Amino acid sequence: MSAQKCFESLVDEKVPVGKPAGLYQPCLVVGGLVYVSGHLPVQPDGGLILGCLGKDLDVEAGKNAARRAGLASLVTLEHCLGSLDKISRVVKLLGMVAATNSFTQHPAVINGCSELYAEVWGPENG
């Protein structure tokens, strides 16, 4: 299944295309690579998932938030490129996590986005 078809099958609710909150491009193609700006975890109703891991949110809630941020990034990529099929693989994922000082499970949280990308492009390319 193509990346675009896979993405379409995963999105059960519309994720709104975000608008830049400053002077930056949501995505930019340079030398055969596409760079996508940071994304927030947008809920189906357009609200944000907010909270602090280790205080307000547990690992599963954080993982879901990372997946939602990943979905938002995919919507931006689709909007900018026309199709996710134009992307052959993910080279880098940078995730930022709001957490207490004692929280140590950051990789488990960011896996929410990593697993989404692996679903779209396959485990070797996602």
Q: Which stretches of residues belong to each language-model region?
A:
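N-terminal presequence-like segments and the immediate start of the first folded domain
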Residues: M1-L94, A99-G126
